[in-house]
């Protein structure tokens, strides 16, 4: 039954003219982003959030490699990796990959055109005896990200000091490949995004005020077309994603809280929420909500062979089953 459900979803994904053509890109690229409901358009310095905002990696000051592998509901294999590295003091480059594979989908011939009951019976017996042939669905995306950090000073008038704003911008160039049964499809998409990071402690002269960030991204600029070998075209529509985050150090205990919000405008308008608690920069507790339901997760950071390692876990209970996801990130310098 699950195979039938998955195949139905695949048909929507491969042959829809609108919002399903890029659904595999929205599974998630890290346990951190998945755990907070993927409300990461305004989350800075998280390279794996590139699909929602390519500008965020400009605020990362180190090279990193991350990898996520998932057996989705015991039916599909999904992976994601990300490599990012600074190119000087203000520019960061990233290369990322995503892949979804659903294998051994049984091909069931259409026998509705056989009206004779005996002929239909014989056909079914022959098919069962010989076995059904199968095919696979593969969807991959390769993305290049380039992000640059800009700084501006703002004089609010009532302050003795000017306010320093961090304003990175970024762009994604993505190559998409699809393979379903005997069909192949390809397309190229472009995203552009930006962040504005505001230190509220400088705005209000209150030392414990947090860091407020606004983010916005236009994905699939002017639409991304998937060209199929059948000469059919699918269109991934342009979407505008906007959101905000607020990072606050708690006074009494050594905990930092991140509150995240994101909304998407386009053919599938939606809202996403997330929260992350960071305990002593070592333990991460995460929760979030999106159209798939409620998510939860944890993360741990430690040193191994003089490299900083992040291990993450996220969990989702879905109608198709429970999804457990694990990933790791290695900071290379």
Which ranges hold each PLM region?
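Sec-dependent N-terminal signal peptides
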Residues: 3-13
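Subset of outer-membrane beta-barrel
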Residues: 17-333
């Amino acid at each position: 039954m699950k195979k039938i459900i998955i195949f139905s979803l695949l048909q929507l994904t491969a042959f829809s003219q609108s919002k399903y053509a890029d659904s595999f890109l929205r599974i998630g690229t890290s346990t951190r982003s998945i755990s907070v409901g993927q409300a990461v358009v305004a989350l800075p310095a998280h390279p794996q959030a590139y699909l929602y905002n390519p500008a965020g990696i400009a605020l990362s000051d180190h090279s990193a490699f991350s990898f996520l592998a998932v057996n989705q509901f015991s039916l599909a294999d999904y992976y994601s990796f990300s490599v990012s590295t600074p190119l000087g003091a203000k520019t960061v480059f990233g290369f990322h990959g995503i892949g979804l594979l659903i294998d051994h989908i049984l091909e069931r011939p259409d026998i509705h055109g056989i009206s004779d009951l005996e002929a239909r019976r014989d056909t079914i017996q022959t098919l069962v005896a010989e076995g059904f042939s199968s095919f696979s669905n593969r969807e991959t995306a390769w993305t290049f990200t380039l992000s640059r950090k800009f700084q501006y000073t703002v004089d609010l008038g009532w302050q003795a000091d000017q306010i320093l704003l961090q304003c990175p911008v970024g762009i994604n160039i993505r190559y998409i490949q699809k393979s379903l049964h005997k069909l192949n499809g390809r397309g190229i998409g472009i995203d552009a995004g930006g962040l504005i990071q505001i230190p509220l402690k400088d705005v209000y002269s209150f030392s414990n005020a947090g860091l407020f960030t606004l983010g916005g991204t236009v994905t699939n600029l002017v639409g991304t077309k998937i060209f199929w070998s059948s000469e059919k075209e699918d269109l991934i529509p342009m979407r505008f994603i906007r959101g905000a985050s607020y990072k606050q150090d708690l006074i009494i205990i050594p905990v930092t809280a991140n509150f995240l919000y994101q909304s998407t405008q386009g053919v599938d308008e939606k809202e996403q929420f997330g929260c992350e608690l960071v305990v002593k920069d070592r333990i991460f507790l995460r929760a979030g909500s999106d159209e798939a339901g409620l998510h939860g997760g944890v993360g741990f950071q430690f040193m191994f062979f003089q490299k900083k390692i992040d291990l993450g876990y996220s969990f989702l209970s879905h109608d198709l089953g429970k999804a457990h996801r694990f990933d790791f990130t290695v900071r290379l310098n």
